[in-house]
């Protein structure tokens, strides 16, 4: 039986589709490509192979580093080396820093055992003369007197040929930053190509389109070898042209009737942004119905971004709705080995923030093993180590036995280094790299989730797509901290923009991790992206830890200290001094960063920080500070004045609490859930920093002597008047959380009562419109149980089991039993006393009674419904819960929009979920023109 290898692939394509081949656009030219047929490529490769065979150092089996620019040179000389029986090693771009470049080349010289390097004369200057690389430029290669002869030239190999011989080596970065060499054999590549073709079926579609350099396996395997395997045309364009203007990608798809291309998440985001800037689809009359596969990998795919792009491409240009296919692959698997052909439907149903990656293709088996035992897991929800096996997976690193031992299990499975789960639907879901997890005080955070939250915040002064997060342990620290580096979009001397960007990033970091991140802007020469658009998180982390960025740190610190537009004001009296001391301790900031006139909520303080500061300040001052005084005081100076004047009792009821005063967009008004407290919104408000002001409305009855509202309408009247005092004119954006949805609806109607459409946005956060009749049936005990669950004093499933135990007990005894079951740490975090919980429960019960007889009527301009996983007491399935939410349709004049949210009803504003709520809420308001 005749065996085949890569040479047979090109021979077959050259003989079968003589007119087909490769179109190459030169950098800066996207109008007139150069054409190279597969037959011409084979002829050039065979001719060069004969010449190489006459030259010393190019014997069959020799390693040759291929360091060339441009697709044409790389293709011709890659195949020339393969035909000559040599093993090409695809070089990666060299670092600009001379010492880093020298270190890399010395490492390659050792790793590859003193190879020859094939390059162009114009690139030889990139090699420091003291490194001693053996260079051979392609211009000097000419025909010799002894032609290279081999049975591999122009005819299939004989039966004795070993198809497991190494075909080529790819270089990939290791954990130390030094490159590892990945050997790809003929049999491995052929297995991978067969698996890809079985899934993608390129033979049935048009050409491929590539913009990625040949040093990346996605370009070489997916966009060069695979089209040859499928005997279809391939188009190549310079990366700089596509990244500079992503719409060129669509223009070329239309022009060449492209069936498959590739774009990582960052390019999809740029493409969406470019399309949204277009005046109308008619300005670009493209027909993109030919595009079957828009593969995406290399970084996590944000579902919202990709789904919006998919809708735009489908509606405006005829692209199939399942065109975008998030994929997983590595150099070690010959690029893509798992493709998601159910995007975005699968992600929408399962409410994923980041796209799943489908199922493994033929030739690759996948398993997830336990982080603790190393055994394969059976639980589809368990995150573990992703491991691969099969003929499409490599067998070990070249000349690096230690890395090979570390990367394979005793039973021969490849450890990818990724954390993952394979869900009940068989879909691969990545959860980050195991070595990149950020561990802070025992809690683990995924860097790409923090990066995504910063991107979502659209921080002014931060270049999109150039933010990197990682764990960083300063000297003498007991735990890791979060470090965030970014590429500034402002001039170096612009200290105002520098300070605003830093503060905004700090706010997001606090909300995501509960800790204050270390923030550092770096320049474009340092934050260099790979050919696939990735920045090496490990290299940046190593640079920070080694002191390589000391100059950036000194410049950043010096310029931040120069900022005087909002000077940090020191304490002016004893009360301010004591309050400030408590704040500096609890908020983990210095007196240079935080003063008595620093806006507390805008600074990024979380609700738990606020409670901890309250407790610390009370200890120092020796008396209680009402929470009302704190949340109604924007600064320490205002709070100190209240305390000194004795005006920290109940006073006159004012429902408005400004949580975030900054921003130019329409203010957002948030109405409390049952229980009446607004601290639940603190973290959410912080994410809107510099975007739009955020005000919350607190219930009457939280303080001694305040009577609760007797009805939904009474509360709505009070809130309407309060909103009008602060914001006399529309447009208005109003949202309510749970119980607050009913009040918010009534407030929106009052604001909209003159028919001027002054409320473009009314949002209901997880409560159906006719739920008042259920709430009104809650007695005091049920109010206590639901309040305790919402405060995380008890688990949600304990509501029913504890009900029978508490019912009939005296109220003080029931309070004691709840506090006895609650985690002590949670009680301390909430600063909760029996008397405080009693008052809170009475208010909750009174608010429940206020819903008696309430039935929503009338309409507001629009309704946006946000719904979660249902509580067992409210609905048994998500579909049942959504059906109840659909009743909101009758209360909006425009089409009601429904937005799924992750998490449970009572946990929406928790640290794990709040940034996701922000993302969905913010985009819903943008869609309503706000």
Swiss-Prot record:
Region (Thioesterase (TE) domain): 667-920
One MF annotation (Gene Ontology) recorded for this entry: phosphopantetheine binding
Pfam families: AMP-binding (PF00501), PP-binding (PF00550), Thioesterase (PF00975)
Claim: Phosphoprotein is one of the keywords in the record: yes
One Gene Ontology term from the biological process aspect of the record: fatty acid biosynthetic process
Pathway noted in the entry: Secondary metabolite biosynthesis
SMART domains in the record: PKS_PP
Family: Belongs to the NRP synthetase family.
Name this polypeptide is given: Nonribosomal peptide synthetase btyA
Source species of the chain: Aspergillus terreus (strain NIH 2624 / FGSC A1156)
């Amino acid at each position: 039986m005749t065996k085949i290898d890569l040479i047979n692939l090109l021979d077959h394509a050259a003989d079968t589709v003589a007119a087909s081949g490769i179109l190459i656009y030169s950098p800066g030219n996207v109008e007139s490509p150069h054409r190279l047929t597969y037959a011409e490529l084979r002829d050039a490769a065979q001719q060069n192979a004969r010449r190489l065979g006459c030259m010393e150092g190019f014997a069959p089996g020799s390693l040759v580093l291929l360091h060339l620019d441009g697709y044409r040179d790389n293709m011709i000389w890659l195949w020339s080396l393969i035909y000559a029986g040599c093993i090409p090693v695809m070089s990666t771009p060299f670092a600009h820093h001379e010492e880093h470049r020298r270190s890399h080349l010395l490492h390659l010289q050792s790793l590859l055992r003193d190879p020859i390097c094939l390059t162009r004369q114009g690139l030889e200057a990139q090699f420091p003369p003291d490194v001693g690389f053996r260079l051979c430029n392609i211009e000097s290669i000419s025909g010799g007197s002894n032609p290279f002869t081999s049975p591999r030239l122009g005819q299939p190999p004989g039966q004795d040929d070993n198809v497991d011989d190494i075909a080529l080596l790819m270089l990939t970065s290791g954990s130390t930053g030094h490159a590892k060499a990945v050997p790809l054999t003929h049999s491995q590549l052929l297995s991978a190509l067969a698996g890809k073709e079985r899934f993608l079926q390129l033979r049935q579609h048009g050409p491929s389109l590539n913009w990625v350099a040949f040093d990346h396996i996605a370009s070489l395997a997916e966009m060069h070898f695979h089209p040859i395997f499928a005997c279809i045309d391939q188009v190549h364009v310079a990366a700089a042209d596509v990244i500079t203007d992503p719409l060129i990608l669509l223009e070329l798809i239309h022009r060449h009737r492209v069936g498959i291309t590739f774009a990582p998440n960052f390019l999809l985001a740029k493409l969406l942004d470019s399309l949204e800037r277009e005046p109308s689809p008619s300005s670009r009359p493209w027909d993109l119905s030919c595009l079957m596969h828009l593969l995406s990998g290399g970084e996590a795919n944000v579902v919202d971004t990709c789904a919006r792009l998919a809708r735009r491409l489908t509606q405006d240009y005829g692209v199939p709705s399942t065109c975008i296919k998030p994929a997983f692959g590595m150099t070690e698997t010959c690029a893509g080995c798992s493709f998601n052909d159910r995007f975005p439907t699968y992600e929408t149903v399962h409410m994923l923030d980041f796209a799943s990656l489908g199922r493994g293709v033929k030739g690759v088996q996948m398993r997830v093993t336990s982080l603790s035992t190393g055994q394969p897991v059976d639980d589809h929800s368990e995150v573990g180590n992703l491991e691969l096996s099969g003929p499409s997976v490599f067998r070990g690193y070249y000349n690096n036995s230690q890395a090979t031992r570390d990367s394979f299990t005793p039973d021969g499975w490849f450890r990818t280094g990724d954390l993952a789960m394979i869900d009940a639907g068989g879909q691969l879901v990545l959860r980050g790299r195991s070595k990149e997890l950020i561990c802070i005080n025992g809690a683990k955070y995924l860097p790409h989730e923090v990066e995504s939250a910063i991107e979502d915040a659209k921080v002014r002064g931060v270049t999109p797509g150039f933010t990197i997060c990682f764990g960083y342990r300063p000297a003498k620290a007991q735990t890791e901290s979060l470090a965030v580096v970014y590429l500034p979009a402002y001039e170096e001397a612009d200290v105002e923009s520098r300070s605003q960007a830093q503060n905004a990033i700090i706010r997001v970091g606090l909300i995501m991790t509960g800790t204050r991140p270390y923030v550092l802007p770096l320049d474009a020469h340092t934050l260099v992206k790979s050919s696939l658009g990735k920045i090496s998180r490990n290299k940046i982390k190593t640079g920070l830890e080694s002191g390589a960025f000391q100059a950036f740190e000194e410049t950043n610190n010096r310029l931040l200290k120069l900022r005087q537009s909002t000077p940090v004001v020191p304490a002016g009296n004893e009360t301010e001094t004591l309050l400030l001391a408590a704040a500096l301790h609890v908020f983990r900031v210095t007196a240079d960063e935080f003063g008595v006139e620093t806006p507390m909520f805008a600074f990024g303080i979380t609700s738990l920080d606020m409670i901890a500061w309250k407790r610390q300040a009370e200890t120092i001052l020796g008396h209680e500070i009402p929470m009302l005084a704190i949340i109604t005081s924007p600064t320490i100076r205002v709070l100190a004045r209240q305390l000194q004047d004795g005006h920290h009792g109940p006073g006159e009821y004012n429902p408005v609490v400004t949580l975030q005063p900054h921003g130019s967009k329409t203010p957002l008004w948030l109405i409390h859930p049952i229980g009446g407290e607004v601290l639940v919104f603190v973290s959410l408000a912080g994410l809107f920093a510099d975007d739009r002001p955020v005000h919350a409305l607190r219930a009457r009855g939280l303080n001694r002597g305040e009577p609760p509202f007797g009805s939904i309408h009474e509360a709505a009247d009070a809130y309407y008047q309060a909103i009008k005092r602060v914001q006399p004119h529309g447009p208005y954006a109003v949202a309510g959380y749970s119980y607050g949805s009913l009040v918010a609806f009534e407030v929106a109607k009052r604001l909209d009562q003159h028919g001027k459409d002054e409320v473009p946005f009314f949002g209901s956060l997880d409560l159906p419109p006719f739920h008042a009749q259920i709430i009104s049936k809650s007695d005091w005990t049920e109010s206590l149980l639901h309040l305790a669950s919402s405060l995380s004093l008890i688990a949600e499933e304990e509501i029913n089991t504890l009900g029978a135990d508490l019912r009939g007990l005296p109220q003080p005894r029931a309070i004691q039993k709840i506090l006895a079951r609650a985690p002590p740490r949670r009680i301390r975090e909430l600063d909760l006393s029996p008397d405080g919980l009693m008052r809170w429960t009475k208010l909750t019960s009174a608010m429940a009674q206020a819903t008696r007889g309430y039935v929503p009527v009338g309409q507001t301009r629009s309704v946006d419904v946000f719904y979660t996983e249902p509580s067992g007491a409210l609905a048994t399935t998500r579909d049942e819960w959504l059906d109840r939410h659909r009743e909101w349709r009758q209360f909006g004049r425009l089409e009601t929009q429904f937005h799924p949210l992750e998490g449970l009803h009572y946990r929406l504003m928790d640290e794990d979920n709040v940034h996701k709520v922000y993302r969905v809420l913010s985009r819903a308001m943008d869609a309503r023109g706000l």
